[in-house]
């Protein structure tokens, strides 16, 4: 337990927020470069901040810290992204503001295989074939993020 009213707690909170701002700035830079390469402009920017903590108020007015590990904010009307995998689509969603989920939604399809097991069992040629069959060119990522380690996003979203 880390008390955010202590010096250490305040330092942690500031550091975590700086890391979040850094990640967001990097995503904006990636999006800007993609838009430039495609000679277009984004119609909207949707953040998918996850594995992060926020100060929020519950329905009863209690202020709490919500840490969303594997989840993303989904307050009423808030736009979000639920990614699939390297070979499946992602979904742009609008939050329902469901209090029983603390205004949160899944950050993705969910794993069916751990990172360590994926690194031990999936080969690079196997990954390349799966992606080639889907017409996907890999420019980043590793075996622990291979499409076969995730649930089918279409089933998850239905």
Positions of predicted regions on the chain:
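Domain-length cofactor-binding catalytic modules of enzymes
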Residues: 1-158
């Amino acid at each position: 337990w880390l008390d955010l009213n202590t010096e250490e707690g305040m330092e942690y909170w500031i550091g975590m927020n700086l890391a979040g701002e850094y990640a967001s700035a990097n995503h904006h830079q990636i999006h800007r470069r993609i838009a430039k390469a495609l000679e277009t402009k984004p119609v909207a920017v949707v953040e998918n901040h996850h594995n992060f903590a926020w100060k929020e108020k519950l329905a009863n007015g209690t202020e709490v810290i919500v840490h969303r590990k594997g989840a993303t904010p989904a307050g009423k009307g808030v736009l979000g992204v639920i990614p699939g995998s390297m070979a499946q689509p992602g979904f742009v969603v609008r939050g329902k503001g469901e209090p029983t989920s603390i205004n949160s939604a899944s950050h993705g399809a969910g794993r069916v295989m751990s990172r360590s097991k994926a690194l031990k069992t999936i080969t690079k040629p196997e990954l390349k074939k799966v992606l080639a069959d889907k017409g996907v060119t890999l420019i980043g990522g590793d075996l622990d993020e291979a499409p076969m380690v995730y649930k089918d996003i279409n089933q998850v979203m239905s």
